[in-house]
Amino acid sequence: AVIYYSSSTSWIPEYFMDLGASDTALFDIDNLTLANSQATYDSLMNYDVFFIKGGDQWDYYNTWKNTKVEDAITDKFNQGGVIMGTSAGMAILSKLIFTAENGSVYPDDAMTDENDPDITLADDFLNIFSEYIFDTHFVERGRLGRLIPFCLNTSLSTFNNSHFKNGLGVDDRTAICIDSNNIGEVMGSAAVTI
Protein backbone atom coordinates (compact mmCIF):
# COMPACT_ATOMS: atom_id res chain seq x y z
CA ALA A 1 0.00 0.00 0.00
CA VAL A 2 1.37 3.40 -0.97
CA ILE A 3 -0.05 5.96 1.43
CA TYR A 4 0.21 9.68 0.89
CA TYR A 5 -1.48 12.99 1.55
CA SER A 6 -1.09 15.00 -1.62
CA SER A 7 -0.99 14.54 -5.37
CA SER A 8 -0.50 11.07 -6.73
CA THR A 9 2.76 9.66 -7.96
CA SER A 10 1.42 7.08 -10.37
CA TRP A 11 4.77 5.41 -11.11
CA ILE A 12 5.29 4.15 -7.53
CA PRO A 13 2.92 1.14 -7.67
CA GLU A 14 4.49 -0.04 -10.93
CA TYR A 15 7.94 0.41 -9.39
CA PHE A 16 7.01 -1.87 -6.47
CA MET A 17 5.46 -4.40 -8.86
CA ASP A 18 8.72 -4.45 -10.84
CA LEU A 19 10.52 -5.21 -7.57
CA GLY A 20 8.28 -8.23 -6.94
CA ALA A 21 5.20 -6.98 -5.09
CA SER A 22 2.16 -9.15 -5.81
CA ASP A 23 -0.27 -6.24 -5.52
CA THR A 24 -0.14 -2.50 -4.91
CA ALA A 25 -2.63 0.28 -4.34
CA LEU A 26 -2.46 4.05 -3.94
CA PHE A 27 -4.23 5.56 -0.93
CA ASP A 28 -4.63 9.34 -1.17
CA ILE A 29 -5.73 10.11 2.39
CA ASP A 30 -5.91 13.89 2.52
CA ASN A 31 -8.78 14.60 4.91
CA LEU A 32 -10.09 13.52 8.30
CA THR A 33 -13.14 11.77 6.86
CA LEU A 34 -10.99 9.39 4.81
CA ALA A 35 -8.36 9.11 7.53
CA ASN A 36 -10.93 8.06 10.11
CA SER A 37 -12.95 5.74 7.87
CA GLN A 38 -13.28 2.09 8.85
CA ALA A 39 -13.28 1.26 5.12
CA THR A 40 -9.87 2.95 4.77
CA TYR A 41 -8.55 0.96 7.73
CA ASP A 42 -9.93 -2.32 6.34
CA SER A 43 -8.47 -1.67 2.88
CA LEU A 44 -5.04 -0.79 4.27
CA MET A 45 -4.97 -3.90 6.42
CA ASN A 46 -5.13 -6.05 3.26
CA TYR A 47 -1.50 -5.12 2.57
CA ASP A 48 1.67 -6.37 4.27
CA VAL A 49 3.85 -3.38 3.39
CA PHE A 50 3.06 0.31 3.81
CA PHE A 51 5.15 2.90 1.98
CA ILE A 52 4.49 6.48 3.10
CA LYS A 53 5.45 9.03 0.47
CA GLY A 54 7.31 12.21 1.07
CA GLY A 55 5.53 15.52 1.24
CA ASP A 56 4.87 17.52 4.38
CA GLN A 57 4.99 15.77 7.73
CA TRP A 58 2.67 18.41 9.20
CA ASP A 59 -0.04 17.28 6.77
CA TYR A 60 0.44 13.67 7.89
CA TYR A 61 0.55 14.56 11.58
CA ASN A 62 -2.36 16.99 11.44
CA THR A 63 -4.62 14.76 9.32
CA TRP A 64 -3.76 11.22 10.46
CA LYS A 65 -3.14 11.64 14.20
CA ASN A 66 -5.71 9.73 16.32
CA THR A 67 -7.41 8.26 13.25
CA LYS A 68 -7.95 4.85 11.66
CA VAL A 69 -4.93 5.49 9.43
CA GLU A 70 -2.70 5.84 12.48
CA ASP A 71 -4.30 2.69 13.89
CA ALA A 72 -3.72 0.77 10.64
CA ILE A 73 -0.04 1.75 10.46
CA THR A 74 0.54 0.86 14.10
CA ASP A 75 -1.49 -2.36 13.93
CA LYS A 76 0.27 -3.54 10.77
CA PHE A 77 3.68 -2.83 12.33
CA ASN A 78 2.70 -4.74 15.49
CA GLN A 79 1.59 -7.68 13.30
CA GLY A 80 5.04 -7.82 11.71
CA GLY A 81 4.29 -5.77 8.61
CA VAL A 82 6.89 -3.60 6.93
CA ILE A 83 6.43 0.13 7.38
CA MET A 84 8.65 2.42 5.34
CA GLY A 85 8.73 5.97 4.14
CA THR A 86 10.73 8.53 2.28
CA SER A 87 11.35 12.13 3.30
CA ALA A 88 8.33 13.27 5.35
CA GLY A 89 7.03 9.70 5.21
CA MET A 90 10.11 8.52 7.08
CA ALA A 91 10.21 11.50 9.44
CA ILE A 92 6.84 10.57 10.97
CA LEU A 93 7.88 7.00 11.87
CA SER A 94 10.00 7.84 14.91
CA LYS A 95 8.71 8.38 18.45
CA LEU A 96 9.91 11.98 18.48
CA ILE A 97 9.04 13.78 15.25
CA PHE A 98 9.70 17.19 13.83
CA THR A 99 6.15 18.11 12.78
CA ALA A 100 7.14 21.11 10.62
CA GLU A 101 4.00 22.85 11.85
CA ASN A 102 5.59 26.22 11.05
CA GLY A 103 7.43 24.97 7.98
CA SER A 104 11.00 23.78 7.83
CA VAL A 105 13.63 24.95 10.28
CA TYR A 106 17.08 25.65 8.93
CA PRO A 107 20.19 24.24 10.62
CA ASP A 108 21.74 27.63 11.38
CA ASP A 109 18.55 28.76 13.16
CA ALA A 110 18.24 25.48 15.06
CA MET A 111 21.88 25.61 16.19
CA THR A 112 21.34 29.07 17.67
CA ASP A 113 18.57 27.90 20.01
CA GLU A 114 17.50 24.27 20.50
CA ASN A 115 14.23 25.57 21.95
CA ASP A 116 13.47 27.84 18.97
CA PRO A 117 9.66 28.01 18.52
CA ASP A 118 10.04 26.83 14.92
CA ILE A 119 11.37 23.51 16.23
CA THR A 120 7.94 21.93 16.56
CA LEU A 121 8.39 18.48 18.03
CA ALA A 122 5.77 15.93 19.03
CA ASP A 123 5.89 12.53 20.70
CA ASP A 124 2.23 11.55 20.41
CA PHE A 125 1.94 10.07 16.94
CA LEU A 126 2.93 6.73 15.41
CA ASN A 127 5.79 5.71 17.71
CA ILE A 128 7.00 3.00 15.34
CA PHE A 129 10.64 3.50 16.35
CA SER A 130 10.45 4.52 19.98
CA GLU A 131 13.99 5.64 20.75
CA TYR A 132 14.70 7.74 17.69
CA ILE A 133 14.10 10.98 15.87
CA PHE A 134 14.58 10.71 12.11
CA ASP A 135 15.68 13.37 9.65
CA THR A 136 16.07 12.94 5.89
CA HIS A 137 17.94 14.59 3.00
CA PHE A 138 20.61 14.68 5.64
CA VAL A 139 23.98 15.58 4.10
CA GLU A 140 22.45 17.19 1.01
CA ARG A 141 20.66 19.80 3.15
CA GLY A 142 23.21 20.03 5.94
CA ARG A 143 20.77 18.78 8.57
CA LEU A 144 23.23 17.67 11.24
CA GLY A 145 22.94 21.25 12.43
CA ARG A 146 19.27 20.73 13.18
CA LEU A 147 19.24 17.08 14.24
CA ILE A 148 21.50 17.80 17.21
CA PRO A 149 19.19 20.58 18.49
CA PHE A 150 16.20 18.26 17.96
CA CYS A 151 17.89 15.76 20.28
CA LEU A 152 18.74 18.46 22.82
CA ASN A 153 15.29 20.09 22.80
CA THR A 154 13.70 19.96 26.24
CA SER A 155 10.14 20.94 25.36
CA LEU A 156 8.62 17.45 25.71
CA SER A 157 8.37 15.92 29.16
CA THR A 158 8.61 12.31 27.98
CA PHE A 159 12.01 13.02 26.54
CA ASN A 160 13.11 15.12 29.49
CA ASN A 161 12.86 11.91 31.53
CA SER A 162 14.67 9.76 28.99
CA HIS A 163 18.36 9.04 29.45
CA PHE A 164 19.03 9.27 25.71
CA LYS A 165 17.59 10.25 22.36
CA ASN A 166 19.00 8.85 19.16
CA GLY A 167 19.11 11.09 16.14
CA LEU A 168 19.19 9.24 12.84
CA GLY A 169 19.89 11.15 9.62
CA VAL A 170 19.41 9.41 6.28
CA ASP A 171 20.92 10.64 3.02
CA ASP A 172 19.13 10.66 -0.32
CA ARG A 173 19.14 7.38 -2.30
CA THR A 174 19.84 5.57 0.95
CA ALA A 175 17.74 3.51 3.36
CA ILE A 176 18.12 1.97 6.76
CA CYS A 177 16.17 -1.20 7.43
CA ILE A 178 15.60 -1.66 11.16
CA ASP A 179 14.44 -5.07 12.35
CA SER A 180 12.43 -6.06 15.42
CA ASN A 181 15.66 -6.34 17.45
CA ASN A 182 16.46 -2.70 16.66
CA ILE A 183 19.33 -3.73 14.38
CA GLY A 184 19.71 -1.60 11.26
CA GLU A 185 21.21 -2.37 7.87
CA VAL A 186 22.09 0.52 5.57
CA MET A 187 21.41 0.13 1.86
CA GLY A 188 21.94 2.49 -1.03
CA SER A 189 24.57 4.88 -2.31
CA ALA A 190 25.22 7.21 0.64
CA ALA A 191 25.20 7.10 4.44
CA VAL A 192 23.14 7.08 7.60
CA THR A 193 24.35 9.24 10.48
CA ILE A 194 23.51 8.22 14.04
Task: Name these PLM-found stretches.
Residues 57-67:
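Glycine/threonine-rich flexible loop motifs
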Residues 1-53:
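N-terminal beta1-alpha1 cap of cysteine-dependent amidohydrolase-like domains
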Residues 47-48, 60, 84, 88-89:
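A substrate-binding/cap region within the structured catalytic cores of diverse enzymes
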Residues 22, 45-49, 79-82, 129, ...:
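Loop/turn elements at helix/coil->beta-strand transitions in domains of secreted/extracellular proteins
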Residues 53-54, 77-97:
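Catalytic nucleophile loop
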Residues 43, 66-80:
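Catalytic-core regions built around general acid/base machinery
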Residues 57-58, 90-93, 175-177:
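Short, active-site-adjacent cap segments at secondary-structure transitions
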Residues 7-10, 15-20, 97-99, 103-194:
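C-terminal and late-domain segments of enzyme folds
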